[in-house]
Amino acid sequence: MDSLKFISWYETFLGEDGRKVYAETVLDKREMRTVHMFQVSGSEITVEDSILQKDDKIEVIRRVRANGTADTGIEKNGIAFGMEILLGEGKQLRYGIPSCRYSSGQAGKHTYMEERLTAPVIMAYDESARTAVSVARTRPPADTGKEIRKTGDSRYLHKTEVGSLGYEWREGRENILCARWPYEEMEMSVALDAKGTPVQAFYPIDGNAWEMELHYELQQTCDRTFTDGLYHVFTGLAEQFETEGHHIVSLPFTLKEEIICRETSLMRSYREFGGDGAGFFFHFDPRKGYGSEPSGFGTSFNTIPHSTYVHILEYGFTGRQNHTALILARDKGGEWIEKGEQVVDFFLKHCMMENGWVYSLYDLDREEPFFSFGDPDAPKLHYMDYRGAKGNYLRTMTEPVNDVLEYCKWYREQGHVKKQWLEAVMRYADLLVSLQNEDGSWYRAYEPDGTPVFMLEEPWMTEQERERGRKAASAIPIVFLCNLAEYLSEEVYSTDVENTEPAGSKRSVYLRAAVKAGEYVLSGGCREELFQGGTLDNPNVVDKEAAQYAMAGCWHLYEQTGERRFLEGAATAGKQFVTWNYIWNAPVKEGTVLAEKKFRTKGMGAINSIWCGGVVDIYSLFHIRELYLTGRETGDEFMIRMAEWISTAAHQIMSWPGDRMGFADIGMQPEGFGICPQGMDEGMIQKGDIWGTLGWIYSAGIDGVDRYIRELPQAEQKEEK
């Protein structure tokens, strides 16, 4: 740490000669202090830097003051300050930036707004030395104003406390950790447009006096793995922020009451059609009500709203028809048992082929199922545009069939056997087994005859990158196969009509396939500590859901086999999953819905490494049960605490009898929340925006919470209910 070199600089908004270095410091003693003064547009600017070394940590405090005088009659100016820490090594390091980066550094400069980060920290990890150096902003920004800019401006004035963190890798020469206030996003940003125009903000020099104090902490640690290093600094910051007032939101209702509200809305989205059709029309704008188009966001493929959302049924990914039918049958009983059967029967009749291959989308206008990709005439959803072949994704086939299996389990608990449903489930399971690769993986997508589909592959990709992307969804069937093996372990009758094969032998086939898949996940994502490809709208990128599915799959294998290696895999994936969720409350912009409703980011989940935490959603809820259980089994108290934070934060801005939130009914909630702008020059997301909603919000908000509550100690269950 004592060999680190600090370069301090400033840059003005009107300056044409770029940044100006005002200090270069090599840390050679425990405490250093420098003061610099300069004139900018007639205003005197003073910057005082204090550097204090404490064992393995270095505290940096930067105080900036403007004296409140400025030239009049000239164009408004602004200023930005930066700090670079030279690590002195040219080799490629692995960077951990929570919700942004989890892999080896790329050449060039890569910096991110602090409010985009689930924790304002960057870590550089040396995999050969197993050491990490991190820079964190230990007193994160609390206030931000509106950008002073017109459409197209990428350099602009902004009165904000928000800075940026990132890195620059000059290949073969040096690695640099970067901090700037106000923020910049270089060399690309999603804030303005889809082409990635970079942004730079400058604090206004407008004749008013102001002060800004910035606190950073550098830390060097020795950690066995990259994930351990990032988790180490992440959890440490979480503890610090908790003591400094970054608390989780307080809800005006219990989790049980939250479930009741959501189920009220879900029931009102149900309708029947044709002679045998039934489903939930749960894709809508909560501000406009049932039957409306969901409000928009952008993906790699399509931008919604799109009129087709009002006449399609979705059975997997962002809409779980069979799952919501089960929820209401289980919780409401009565007429919802018969209605639920109608939903599932329609799906099995119209969407499953004889070989077990599954359509997960049905078009009411055309009265037929349709492919998730490949059909140019099919309705447009946000996750499909590939034209090279017609087929469906592994995830969107597995989820609806697993939901039918869960339904079978529930019926058996009531003393009934849905044999035809179970036979359909096993047809799909047999298809999975037949499609499984020798290494235990599956491909991301398949045609109806089982031909794999490889999509979104760029010419510059290495073969390893292609293979990783093709097989990125391999963790997804594990939970299903474990559930089926568990179900069959209690069967005493034949489940194979043709071969009269005992349930026990089928159980071993499915469990063996799950174990093989788990071994692939352990040797791939867990060993490489890189989880990607969980979602379908921005595939082949590192994302939150990939880590979730790997954690959940490994946990279910641990439950089935008792093998420690799967618990260790769940812990590795779980640690990365944790870092996708905010541990601090990023500032919200006045005049927005988020400000009006006192929205807090702590406990909310980022989505993927494109948007990072710039937009958050509630879908960490899907597997907080597995996160909680992994934490309990491994003695990781922070996993347990994060599960609790997620279970609370995810219900913000949900309409309830005490506050309709401006929505059409109770139990409605936005699909997403804008923490940073995303494509704001293209009419997409402004900071403070809300949008949506898609139907999987009911699956996450009801069943994700219910599964978690059921695992809590009895005393805590009573408190939640």
PLM regions: where:
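Beta-strand/loop-rich accessory regions of lumenal/periplasmic or secreted enzymes
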Residues: 6-15, 25-28, 34-41, 46-217
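Aromatic- and glycine-enriched glycan-recognition loops and surfaces
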Residues: 302-311, 316-354, 380-395, 399-401, ...
